Amino acid sequence: MLNQILKDLFDSDPEIKKMAAKAILKDADEPAQVFSSILKEADRPTATVVYDVLFDAEGDFSSIFRAATGDDDAQVRNRAIRYLFRRGMLLPQDGISWLEDSDPFVRRRVISYLFWMNDRTSLGAVVRLSNTDPDPMVRKDCLRLISIWGTKSEVPHLIKALEDPSHMVRTQAVHALKRLTGEDFGEPLGASPEEFEWIVAKWQGWWEIMGERT
């Protein structure tokens, strides 16, 4: 019977695939082992069905989803990381590693989870990305996290972010500076271009003065 179910799992019809995956989940003695073996040779449609079925299934399939964090498909990696976080199995060192993912949406997902985990060991990696990540949304999210976790020692990176080519990143840098330093040189949201540049210049001038005092 298992052979027929496995055959159905590789059927071209997505519904047949899904029913076969659910049958394995229900009837196999060790479904995690069975699915792990299947995924080693599964094509993309079959693997997608397996991940879909396992994502909300009872039981622990963390080993399968941890392996999926190395998948070529960014959507699969993103969902695998989501599964691990939801199950409480995402470790800070995992998050630091996945901040190097090639897909910006995956990196943003990881940053959001690190925020909820409230683990400061990843702050250094987040600070670095705030100035170097190629995606402006990632840089913005990093600055937001720094504003919550960071200290005044992160201020130099925030000052550097004031020169970011993205306006939203620069705006987030101002908010982070206000939160970490207690200083306030104006609200960037709603400011005219001229007013915004004045706010940035005030922060840069303040930083120069701070540097002269140390």
Segments and roles (model prediction):
Residues 166:
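Function-determining sites in protein domains
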